[in-house]
Design a protein with these regions (language model features):
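Hydrophobic (often cysteine-bearing) scaffold residues that line and stabilize catalytic clefts
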Residues: 1, 5, 56, 60, ...
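Short, surface-exposed loop or secondary-structure junction motifs
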Residues: 41, 94-292
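Active-site SXXK
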Residues: 6-10, 23, 29, 52-81, ...
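Short, surface-exposed beta-strand/loop micro-motifs that present aromatic residues
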Residues: 301-310, 314
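Short beta->alpha transition motifs characteristic of CBS
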Residues: 33-41, 297, 318-322
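Short, glycine/proline-biased beta-turn/loop segments that scaffold the active-site neighborhood
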Residues: 79-94
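Short, gly/Ser/Thr-rich active-site loops of penicillin-recognizing serine hydrolases
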Residues: 241, 245, 255, 260-263, ...
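Short, conserved catalytic-motif segment at the N-terminal edge
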Residues: 2-56, 77-79, 128
Length: 357
């Protein structure tokens, strides 16, 4: 059944949906399937490899920012209920009641997106510009996916840990998980370029696609991270084991429960801390995935991570697409097809005794 996933990837690459892709699937720490297909760039000659590092955009939010928040909670450095002005005293009155939990669940009321370069006097004024920008909706009123909330969390975490965000990410997340090929601003021949080019039209591998991440010199809480299949699979495997790794406990089981279960009941969308929660009325992971599976997709590149707590199944998809609002729905459809095929293959191979009715 895994060949159905293979065929989907081959078809999408053949139709020029994206140049290259890497996918892994497994259960409770055991990898069951991997596939690497395509090229580093469109119409290119260099094949992607298992070691290829991809710009994962919004997945930065769950690979770096969310775990740093939960590590800070476990160490007593902050609480989800803490308001942002506890750590950032310059927060204006209209944003003083925003909590860490609301930033994590996308219910802060911050604007979904705006370009810092248009409102900040310089990169040093980025936080000020973010705080000056008017709210888009009342604080805590509704779910509205906003990279700006995780961008703000990045600034907040630098205060909490008293170090730059990329240093905190390495010290507390990527190094303990042995994610040795994950980080900001990578270099080398194994980096899949985004569509960003220099003034001479030359592609710039390691330069993130997100404009606000670039304005912040590649390091931000909402975007900018690069990773490869092995490292992203390590992270997904840890989640599927409720925070455990071969070295011991990375996150407590309760912390994983907090991030992976719905925290927005009664609102317009189901969100955990950083993750979207799939529901029967909104099966964003695909109809075959059990309700309460969780994950996140980067809308620009198409990369995604998904975990089913029911049976410990997980899937990681990394790709170097360049989706725009005009074709984003096609990217979402492809991901659902891919995740459905992967989950079906898992069920056929392992039986369906864990599957809900």
């Amino acid at each position: 059944m895994w060949n159905a996933v293979d065929r989907l990837l081959e078809k999408a690459i053949g139709e020029n949906a994206f140049p290259g892709c890497a996918i892994a699937a497994g259960q409770r720490g055991k990898v069951l399937y991997t596939n690497v297909s395509g090229y580093l760039v469109r119409d290119g000659e260099r094949l992607v490899k298992h070691s290829t590092r991809y710009d994962v955009g919004a997945l930065t939010q769950v690979l770096v920012t969310m775990p740093l928040c939960m590590i800070a909670v476990e160490r007593g450095l902050l609480g989800p209920e803490d308001t942002v002005d506890r750590f950032l005293p310059e927060v204006p009155a209209d944003k003083k009641t925003i909590t860490v939990a609301q930033l994590l669940t996308q219910t802060s009321g911050l604007s979904p997106h705006f370009l810092l370069q248009e409102e900040a006097r310089s990169d040093k004024d980025a936080l000020g510009a973010l705080l000056r920008h008017p709210l888009a909706s009342p604080v805590g009123g509704k779910v509205s996916d906003s990279g700006m909330g995780f961008l703000l969390l990045g600034f907040l975490l630098e205060k909490v840990f008293d170090m730059p965000l990329d240093e905190a990410a390495k010290r507390f997340v990527t190094a303990p998980l042995h994610m040795n090929h994950t980080g900001y601003l990578p270099s080398g021949s194994d980096v899949a370029p985004t569509s960003i080019r220099d003034d001479n039209g030359v592609l710039q591998p390691g330069c993130p696609l997100d404009g606000n991440a670039r304005f912040l010199h590649g390091v931000a809480g909402h975007s900018g991270l690069f990773t490869n299949l092995e490292d992203a699979t390590r992270f997904a495997s840890m989640l599927s084991l409720n925070g455990r790794t071969e070295d011991g406990v990375f996150l407590s089981q309760r912390a994983v429960h907090l991030v992976s279960t719905e925290r927005t009941r009664g609102m317009n969308a189901a969100r955990g801390y950083g993750f979207h929660i799939t529901k029967r009325q909104n099966p964003f992971l695909g109809m075959l995935w059990p309700s309460d599976g969780y994950g996140l997709r980067d809308p620009a590149s198409g990369s995604a991570i998904a975990v089913s707590p029911l049976d410990g199944f997980f899937t990681v998809v990394l790709m170097n697409g360049a989706y725009t609002p005009a074709n984003r729905a096609e990217g979402e459809r492809f991901l659902r097809q891919c995740l459905n095929a992967a989950y079906a293959a898992f069920q056929h191979e392992n039986g369906a005794e864990d599957c809900e009715a």
